[in-house]
Each structure stands twice: as structure tokens, then as C-alpha cells.
Amino acid sequence: MSMTDPIADMLVRINNAASVGKPNVRFPFSRVKLAIALVLKHEGYIFDAKVIQGDNSKSDIEIVLKYFEGRPVIRILKRVSRSGLRKYCGKAELPKVLGGLGISIISTSKGIMIDSKARESGVGGEVLCFVA
């Protein structure tokens, strides 16, 4: 079965696993998904993200979720730009999430980064998702 939006699938898997209290979650490997997972790790929303060898020689990404006082650290994980409607922003229009308390993950010409780093670098790009 083909997947129309693999990034949305990844975000939904993370949301579902966090809402039921699972310690980790796995999904099929792609470089974009790995970059998003590493951004989440760097920003402190998850403990770890690693590539593991899955079944039939296909790689998977495993994320170890982070909880604080029994509640998931990731409260909001929302896909913004999707396959049917892409959302692009210049460096001046990059959105702030919850007044700067959350992050937006941006795909730029310099790689996948958070909104504040994109502003510092002076680049815009496709707004992939919001995290808070």
C-alpha cells in the first residue's frame, strides 16, 4: 500500500504512541523523517532517534519518547504543509508557535531546521510542522 504523506504518517504515529504512553515508536526510514527526528531530539522533545535494521532488509527509525510527570513532552504535533496544499514562507513570514514557546520545523535550501535558526540564517522554506 502506498502512502501519500509519509511525514504526516510519522507525526500521527508519534502522537498516537505518546497519547497511550508507549516508551518508543517505529516507522519506515527516510532521510527527511530522520532529519525531523534529529531536530526533535536536539530541541529536547524526545530522548533518542536511531536507525535500526527492520524486516526484509528495510531500515526503520525508532524514537524514544520523553515524558514529564507522566505526561508526554510533545503536546502539539501538527502537520502544516501537506501534499495537497504546500505552505511556503519567506524569512520574514516564518511562523512562531505559541508565541515562541513551541517550534516550527522548516525545510530550507540549507536543510531541515527550526524557525529561529532559519531566521538567523536568513532563509525561508516549506513549513513542515508545528511542535509544542
UniProtKB/Swiss-Prot annotation:
PANTHER family per UniProt: 40S RIBOSOMAL PROTEIN S15A (PTHR11758)
NCBIfam families for the chain: PRK00136.1 (NF001109)
Role: One of the primary rRNA binding proteins, it binds directly to 16S rRNA central domain where it helps coordinate assembly of the platform of the 30S subunit.
Classification via InterPro entries: Ribosomal_uS8, Ribosomal_uS8_CS, Ribosomal_uS8_sf
Official protein name in the record: Small ribosomal subunit protein uS8
Example GO molecular function: rRNA binding
Protein's gene: rpsH
Pfam families the UniProt entry points to: Ribosomal_S8
HAMAP family hit by this protein: Ribosomal_uS8_B
Taxonomic path: Bacteria, Pseudomonadati, Pseudomonadota, Gammaproteobacteria, Lysobacterales
Organism encoding this protein: Xylella fastidiosa (strain 9a5c)
Signal peptide region: none
Keyword rRNA-binding attached: yes
Gene Ontology terms: cellular component: ribonucleoprotein complex; ribosome
Family to which the UniProt record says this protein belongs: Belongs to the universal ribosomal protein uS8 family.
Ribosomal protein as UniProt keyword: yes
Xref: PROSITE patterns: RIBOSOMAL_S8
Oligomer status and interactors: Part of the 30S ribosomal subunit. Contacts proteins S5 and S12.
UniProt keyword terms in alphabetical order: Ribonucleoprotein, Ribosomal protein, RNA-binding, rRNA-binding
Cystine bridges: none
GO biological process, one term: translation
